[in-house]
Amino acid sequence: MRNNYLPTDYQAFIAKSRYAKYFDGKGREDWSETVSRYMTNVVRPKVGAEYNTSQLEQAILGLEVMPSMRAMMTAGPALARDNTAGYNCSYLPVDDPKAFDEAMFILLCGTGVGFSVERQFVQRLRS
């Protein structure tokens, strides 16, 4: 049985506005469709067809367990293309001009970037 009920209006708003995928002409997914997309694109390819994932799916639907919400949000082509989209944040020292390229790419994937501009790193930019 699929549970599409989220206990509070706030939870329903967050799930719909942050994690549900938008489809032209249909609108946004409901909670069960978001969970199904995650299971189809992230979990099942990793565990294989021989493993029954219905208990895990029901636990996610019932909010008993919660996977990476970034992975739930980007499950599908975006996450398959580059797993950077599955992370909340990243870090890099700014010690090479390429760090700026890397930071931009990571940000475009929707992942936050922390960085260090400590003297020992920044001095390497001059070389």
Name the predicted role of every residue range.
Residues 1-127:
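Extended catalytic cores of very large enzyme megasubunits
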